[in-house]
């Protein structure tokens, strides 16, 4: 609890709000070669590296990730959800916000089924999250 004198000297400071996905809050004007403050729900980018990394302490796996250079010039690390993927260097992908709790520094997800990213094969439930089309009904 501050004293009255401390409050007179310093005062109360407002909490600074910080974005959880800052790369989506920057645009780029290619004609003027300047960054803009226009935010977007998703952004397009090109994969510069595709690989696997291991998660933090209690978990154990090989999580798939991609380094993506976005259209605004920022390079970010994005998680590739689902089982199996067709991404390689120079693939064009769409990223959305959303961190992966056990991978430090990964704040974005790649959208499956958009641009060069294929949907997850043989997925029956939760298909919309993995870009999988509805399977054809079996003939009787």
UniProtKB/Swiss-Prot annotation:
Q: Which UniProt keywords apply?
A: Methylation, Ribonucleoprotein, Ribosomal protein, RNA-binding, rRNA-binding, tRNA-binding
Tell me, in a sentence or two, what this protein's role is: With S4 and S5 plays an important role in translational accuracy.
What is the official name of this protein in its record? Answer: Small ribosomal subunit protein uS12
Pfam families tied to this protein: Ribosom_S12_S23 (PF00164)
Subunit text: Part of the 30S ribosomal subunit. Contacts proteins S8 and S17. May interact with IF1 in the 30S initiation complex.
Recorded hits in Gene3D superfamilies, A to Z, give: Nucleic acid-binding proteins (2.40.50.140)
What the record says about family reads: Belongs to the universal ribosomal protein uS12 family.
Gene giving rise to this polypeptide? rpsL
